[in-house]
Amino acid sequence: MMTRRKKRSCSNQKKEEEKSERIPFDLVIEILLRLPVKSIARFRYVSKLWQSTLRGQHFTESYLTISSSRPKILFTCLKDCETFFFSSPHPQDLSPIAANLHMSFPISCPSNICRPVRGWLCGLHQRTTKGTTVTEPLICNPSTGESVVLRKVKTRRKGVISFLGFDPIDKNFKVLCMTRSCIGRADSEEHQVHTLETGKKPSRKMIECDILHYPVPVEHTNGFSQYDGVCINGVLYYLAIVHGVSDDRYPDVVCFEFGSDKFKYIKKVAGHDMEILYLGRRLNSILVNYKGKLAKLQPNMPNNVCTGIQLWVLEDAEKHEWSSHIYVLPPPWRNVYEETKLCFVGTTRKGEIVLSPNTISDFFYLLYYNPDRNTITIVKIKGMETFQSHKAYTFLDHLEDVNLVPIWRM
């Protein structure tokens, strides 16, 4: 009798201990939201419950919201026909920051990579089939290592221009693809939109463009052209020559609304169209997301001497209204720029303007200019020394997304 009571007592005690040690599932979710993306990818296979939960919209949106509060810097560089991805946190002080290698993807030229959109990127992948080289958009997530190739770009032409965007209404990633005319001017033709919808096969549709234009490359590298575009609140903006509107030497801005599949153009104002030359080379000007608005960064060059930065901010797209801000930089600017070719990277959420060298060296760094304080801060980047002399591209505000490619079922 005593033995039975003892066994029963031990059994009840064990059950009570199990109850006290069991963690509420809501608390488990809170813990998971703070784990790296790759850990989330592994935990999807723990059970069907975890799989459905971690793939659910509530969890993925919550994870992205947390990631938005701590965005990272993304670096890409080409080596041995592979594009390698590194990331690092934003600097908190003057201390060097380490760039951690994620992985590589078969993107033939990193200059063809669109800027990250909610953690995803779009680059161009080349493959040879039956003796013919085919160029296809490749969508990838550097955080999870997942990628997918859009093999149904309907064209026989090699020159495909692709831009990645996100439709905030339908909450789908979309890719705008267009080809270049082979005869005469390189006008955009065969406009297509690919929709990447969760749980479904990617869909494609041809769309009409009533604006005769051609996107303007901002750089040429090893036979490839780099086209610069930025997606803000579901609208893609890129530089282009609009026939009948633009001067053939100086581009306007064309915008594409992913929600309505409509093209529009935005006229530039006097000062946008300056031919920018310095030390015998052309300086870059780029479109950026400046505090939620479209903006354009370009060097300020009175008398062909670089003295600062000019920031154009789009205040009203319908009225084609821009505001201009000129920042005269402190003396260290000229010394740094003359020694190393710097490129505009973008702007931080605080409004700082960021530049960097376009080639990795033993002292690769980011230059932060604070317009309010008129100060320059240089932060060294470590971890990419084995890629010295290779070209690098830097992206700000990279987010980590836990959505995985397989749910798109190619």
From Swiss-Prot:
For this protein, the record's InterPro entries field holds:
F-box-assoc_dom_typ3, F-box-assoc_interact_dom, F-box-like_dom_sf, F-box_dom
Per UniProt, residues of the F-box domain are 17-66
Quote the protein name from its UniProt record. F-box protein At3g61340
